[in-house]
């Protein structure tokens, strides 16, 4: 490839890439070309309206100069006529006008460096000037670019796109020039396009000046790339660098619609809906303009979503489908949760089987309502309760039999049902935790404080009403007889002491068994003195003052060891010192029970007691 001459004003690029050409017959046609170009430029300037006065966002005069005013109808007609003439001269037939010819292609910033790592100029940075046969494509491309720039400036006045007056001059000059397509205005070096790239490759514009941050101003002679250290041609302030894009280098551009994406360090201009007032919808215009690009240059749908395009009309249908699918998924999950809740609510509430009294109420309620004028349910229930208690045992037995059959039928229908299922779950958890705690205390706490029948099954504590029934009310505890909180139910939770009743006495409890009465050890007695209040006084036996003699120590030793093994087999209890004496003959142990009871009462009377705390003995 020919090299550049050294040390000239044309030495502005790499030696292996750029070559400078001069026009043939430039001296002869210079005057005529200059006059025609100046005449056309004057016509264009006279028909344009300066729009920089309405733009308040311009920060300098250079930006106002770079921002071209909108074109008039006359220039638009001329551009279209020249475009049609150039299209008629084409022999390939691949160029077809878009549905809206005023928006022919898309402006894309140069997001990557135009230089490759090895120092050579990439194909994306090559200037488009080529010739196929005797047809000029540079004129067509330049005019097409002018139409695109003018359209963008008209539709988006805030979008800064360079367009200089020399470009229109270059377009008109190239359109009329019969010389080969190596003519350059203002000595801008150009390179012939490679032969393997199709001459009809669409033109995609770049602007390093306005999009890429960190580049020096275009009027400064920055000949060295700060990143690679390779000399590069500076762009004049009135000519923006436009490069063609070859098919093989499309993958180097990360965002084909990057001119709509604000880059780092760039001022973000809001693109409102007012700027998108097209004769056609925005999405249709973009799709129609992109239909001219080859399939490999059209960006995929997912890039439109990831680039964050502000206007909603540019979002493709696939993105809308994805969002709708996510919404449908969230709605489906919420509906699934609601259906679960509804299923729990729709779960049938299994009622408890009716007991005997409920069956009686069900049968006799209509009669009571017919006899009485009362409509209150509480009053009717009271009347039914009085009549139920007035019934004889034989009459009640009929309803008890019906209740038993009702329970059997209920167990057949709902085998795993429990009445606890109808109550709260928190209470159910507490009941599940209680059996483990009560089993730990079941060995030693067998009710030494109260003389009640022992509880055999502590894992399922029941009240006296459920344990003994109505027929054995003599075995109920005092609180259950007065319809208070059951003592056995409290014992099932691990406590052995019952709260005092409303009247402060425990006289309503059933009488204690004789085998549990005995002289308690000192430790146990002191414990009972501390725990029991002073008001819990028991009636003393009237025969207790008759026998004041101390009992034989052998009897105390035998009974103490027997009670210690019966009350708490795990713990060792201290015995009184009199019990440690040698045992008497067996004949002295076999005494009547009355004498032993009197001896215990006399021992209790001789020992110091707080106030009137004495044990009650059986007659």
Swiss-Prot record:
Region Disordered, residue ranges: 1-96, 318-350, 420-441, 496-547, 574-619
Outcome recorded upon mutating residue 465 to C: In a colorectal cancer sample; somatic mutation
Region (Mediates interaction with MAD2L2): 201-395
Stretches the record annotates as Promoter-specific activation domain: 459-505
A GO CC annotation given for this chain: protein-DNA complex
Annotated effect of mutating residue 28 to A: Abolishes CTNNB1 binding
Region of interest: CTNNB1-binding: 1-53
Biased composition range(s): Gly residues: 1-11
Effect annotated for changing residue 322 to A: Loss of sumoylation
Motif (Nuclear localization signal): 425-430
Result for mutant: residue 48 to A: Abolishes CTNNB1 binding
Record flagged with keyword Glycoprotein: no
Tissue specificity annotation: Detected in epithelium from small intestine, with the highest expression at the top of the crypts and a gradient of expression from crypt to villus. Detected in colon epithelium and colon cancer, and in epithelium from mammary gland and carcinomas derived therefrom.
DNA-binding region: 350-418
Function: Participates in the Wnt signaling pathway and modulates MYC expression by binding to its promoter in a sequence-specific manner. Acts as a repressor in the absence of CTNNB1, and as activator in its presence. Activates transcription from promoters with several copies of the Tcf motif 5'-CCTTTGATC-3' in the presence of CTNNB1. TLE1, TLE2, TLE3 and TLE4 repress transactivation mediated by TCF7L2/TCF4 and CTNNB1. Expression of dominant-negative mutants results in cell-cycle arrest in G1. Necessary for the maintenance of the epithelial stem-cell compartment of the small intestine.
Database matches in PANTHER family: TRANSCRIPTION FACTOR 7 FAMILY MEMBER, TRANSCRIPTION FACTOR 7-LIKE 2
Protein name: Transcription factor 7-like 2
Organism: Homo sapiens
Phylogenetic classification of the source organism: Eukaryota, Metazoa, Chordata, Craniata, Vertebrata
């Amino acid at each position: 490839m020919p090299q550049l001459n050294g040390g000239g004003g044309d030495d502005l690029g790499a030696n292996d890439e750029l070559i400078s050409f001069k026009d043939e017959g430039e001296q002869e046609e210079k005057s005529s070309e200059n006059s025609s170009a100046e005449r056309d430029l004057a016509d264009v300037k006279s028909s344009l309206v300066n729009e920089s006065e309405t733009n308040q966002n311009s920060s300098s005069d250079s930006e106002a100069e770079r921002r071209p005013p909108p074109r008039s109808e006359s220039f638009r007609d001329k551009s279209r006529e020249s475009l049609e003439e150039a299209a008629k001269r084409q022999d390939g037939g691949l160029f077809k006008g878009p549905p809206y010819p005023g928006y022919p292609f898309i402006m894309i910033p140069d997001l990557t460096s135009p230089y490759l790592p090895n120092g050579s100029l990439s194909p994306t940075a090559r200037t488009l000037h080529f010739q196929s046969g005797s047809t000029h494509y540079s004129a067509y491309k330049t005019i097409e670019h002018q139409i695109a720039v003018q359209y963008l400036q008209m539709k988006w006045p805030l979008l800064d796109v360079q367009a200089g007056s020399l470009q229109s001059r270059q377009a008109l000059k190239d359109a009329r020039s019969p010389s080969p397509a190596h003519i350059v205005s203002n000595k801008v070096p150009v390179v012939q396009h490679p032969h393997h790239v199709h001459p009809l490759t669409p033109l995609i514009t770049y602007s390093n000046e306005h999009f890429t941050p960190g580049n020096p101003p275009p009027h400064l002679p920055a000949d060295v790339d700060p990143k690679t250290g390779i000399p590069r041609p500076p762009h004049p302030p009135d000519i923006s660098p436009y490069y063609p894009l070859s098919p093989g280098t499309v993958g180097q551009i990360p965002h084909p619609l990057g001119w709509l994406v604000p880059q780092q360090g760039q001022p973000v201009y809001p693109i409102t809906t007012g700027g998108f007032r097209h004769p056609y919808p925005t999405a249709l215009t973009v799709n129609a303009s992109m239909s001219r690009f080859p399939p490999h240059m059209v960006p995929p749908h997912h890039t439109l979503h990831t680039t964050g395009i502000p206007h909603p009309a540019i979002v493709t249908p696939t993105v809308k489908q994805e969002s709708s699918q996510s919404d449908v998924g969230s709605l489906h999950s919420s509906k699934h949760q609601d259906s679960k809740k509804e299923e729990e609510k729709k779960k049938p509430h299994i009622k408890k089987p009716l007991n005997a009294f409920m069956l009686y109420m069900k049968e006799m309620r209509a009669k009571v309502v017919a006899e009485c004028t009362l409509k209150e349910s509480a009053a009717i229930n009271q009347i039914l309760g009085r009549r139920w208690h007035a019934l004889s045992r034989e009459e009640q037995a009929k309803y008890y039999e019906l209740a038993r059959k009702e329970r059997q039928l209920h167990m057949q229908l709902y085998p795993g049902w429990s009445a606890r299922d109808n109550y709260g779950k928190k209470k159910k958890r507490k009941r599940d935790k209680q059996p483990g705690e009560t089993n730990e205390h079941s060995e030693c706490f067998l009710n030494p404080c109260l003389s009640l029948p022992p509880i055999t099954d502590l894992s399922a504590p029941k009240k006296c009403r459920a344990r003994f029934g109505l027929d054995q009310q003599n075995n109920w505890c005092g609180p259950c007889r007065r319809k208070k909180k059951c003592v056995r139910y409290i014992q099932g939770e691990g406590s052995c002491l019952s709260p005092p009743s409303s009247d402060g006495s425990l006289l309503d409890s059933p009488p204690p068994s004789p085998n549990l009465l005995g002289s308690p050890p000192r430790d146990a007695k002191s414990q009972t003195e501390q725990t029991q209040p002073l008001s819990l006084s028991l009636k003393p036996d009237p025969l207790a003052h008759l026998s004041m003699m101390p009992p034989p120590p052998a009897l105390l030793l035998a009974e103490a060891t027997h009670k210690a093994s019966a009350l708490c087999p795990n713990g060792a209890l201290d015995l009184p010192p009199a019990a440690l004496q040698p045992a008497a003959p067996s004949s002295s142990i076999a005494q009547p029970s009355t004498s032993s009871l009197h001896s215990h009462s006399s021992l209790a009377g001789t020992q110091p007691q707080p106030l009137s705390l004495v044990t009650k003995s059986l007659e």
